[in-house]
Amino acid sequence: MIRNFNRSGLRILLFCVTVILLVGSLPARSQGANSDFFPLMAWDDVEDEATVQKMAECGINVIAFVPTNMLYACDKYHVKAIVFDPLVTPNWDKPFDSKPANEELPKLIKAVNNDPAVWGYHLKDEPDGNQFVELGKSAELVRKLAPGKWPYINLPPGMGGWYDTNYIDLFVKTCSPPIISYDNYAIGENVDFSYGFWANIWDVRDASLRNKVPFHTIVLTTAHFNYRIPTAADLRLQVYGSIVYGAKGIGYYKFCSKPLSVLGAPDLGNFRMGPLDEFGEKTETWENLRNLNRQIKNLSSVLLKLHSDDVYHVGDIPERNHGITTNSLVKGLEAGTQFIIGEFTHEDGSRWVMIVNKDLKNSTFCRPTFRETYHHVQYLSPSTGKIAPFPNPWYALAPGQAVLLKLE
């Protein structure tokens, strides 16, 4: 009896140890409060609790630059933190050096890694390929000392073969990121919506699928330089335009209408109408972004389980993209002229499509026709999070709005 009990106990102990090791080795994308944790990041720094609170109230659940003395506020408002330490991350215009970073990282990780808010450690923004070797050394150290935490590196925009198969592939090979994060700002004062956004995300999606690494897109929420003040439609098209390509997280640059207080970042002069203004007050953009974040949260439990199979445009076809093909699930649309359509397969094997109204000025009815006959077409409501029969032909899409359909 005692011998049998000991063997059983040993088996249980070994099982528990195995589970703990497996959980500890999960990549950053798997970590969150629950299974529907869809990262919505404020790509900004925080200096006070009030800002963290306003971010959380807007639906933000990750912050890109969190000093250690603000982790308590992230815990309080249930926001994940990418920990920032100036001894690890160089100023914005300086190359990354693993030597000082790797001297500081062990001390930093020992001090804060057990804090439940910690989701990763900030290494570098927009590095060129020459910095990947140094970044890889520090990323490896983070993985060793803080398994499951994100060695945070964000890539610059780009497009073309060099960016897709050279730059991103080199990044993945050298730094082994759990997530490919990049930024692209499509809304200019003299541009309706930059074609480069679609070419860039096509290449990122391609690299993401090829390397089996999910991607996040950082979009524009604060006007500066020659970028315009984002409207509700601008926000929707940037966010849904990323998700339709398969993005598994969204970042917002910036949240506060003022310069970063870190990285030695310069004052760009005309930051305006971000979610928080230069005095920390909530703006119309804050209200619009909160509304959009609520929609994404209601869709997140499904979005996180979808694998991107294809994406195509109706109307204007951007560079590096394609239109409807003979293999597309959607054969056409009986109303509207400008759409993006993403095809997905759910973990349970079901087929889904997302249709985005690419028109920034006009609403349109969403009346897709399908290549095959489906007995049940349902939609996941962004306002309720519930699935219901799709009310074709009455369902309309606001400018930049999307609908997620389940086909059976």
Question: Which ranges hold each PLM region?
Answer:
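Bacterial N-terminal signal peptides that target proteins for export
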Residues: I2-F15
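Helix-centric, low-specificity signal for extended rod-like, repetitive segments
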Residues: R3-N4, L22, F344
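Bacterial N-terminal signal peptides
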Residues: L13-G24
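Sec/Tat signal peptide C-region and signal peptidase I cleavage site
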Residues: L26-S30
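Glycan-processing catalytic domains of CAZymes
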Residues: Q31-E408
